[in-house]
């Protein structure tokens, strides 16, 4: 089966529908994926860029970003590396009110049973249950 990587810009057009004619391109690809004609692929960097753009440029609130991006990540129309890590990161991003990339790092760490982090960013990481910040002094 043909695999097709989907870039951030197509997801953004689809999620915001600010350019409906471009949003339709991803709708068409999803339909083709659902029919088994191709397999759509995306990675964690694409979703980090989606979250950042929705938050910074489109000014979407975290709960809306969590809701709409989680729906895409959970969709079987896409082959997404680290799907479980992304879903946890989206939940923590919203529920713990932390930066998405920090939530992703914490989720990635927890998946690998790492519970200590050396960081200067105590603000976000202290909010994550089960993680401890290493004393750097």
Residue spans of the language-model regions?
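General small-molecule cofactor/ligand-binding pocket signal
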Residues: 41, 79-81, 134
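Short, well-structured N-terminal submotif of metal-dependent ribonuclease cores
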Residues: 1-42, 57-63, 70, 137
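Structured helix-beta-strand junction loops
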Residues: 35-37, 75, 96
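Acidic, PIN/NYN-like endoribonuclease modules and their adjacent C-terminal/linker elements
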Residues: 1-3, 106-137
């Amino acid at each position: 089966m043909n695999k097709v990587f989907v870039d951030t810009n197509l997801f953004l057009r689809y999620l915001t529908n600010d350019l409906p004619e471009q949003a339709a391109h991803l709708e068409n690809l999803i339909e083709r994926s659902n029919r088994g004609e191709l397999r759509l692929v995306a990675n964690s960097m694409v979703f980090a860029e989606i979250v950042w753009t929705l938050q910074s440029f489109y000014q979407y609130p975290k709960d809306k970003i969590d809701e709409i991006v989680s729906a895409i990540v959970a969709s079987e129309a896409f082959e997404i590396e680290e799907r479980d890590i992304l879903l946890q990161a989206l939940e923590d991003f919203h529920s713990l009110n932390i930066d998405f990339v920090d939530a992703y790092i914490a989720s990635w760490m927890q998946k690998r049973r790492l519970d200590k982090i050396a960081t200067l960013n105590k603000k976000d990481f202290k909010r994550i249950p089960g993680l401890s910040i290493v004393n750097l002094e």
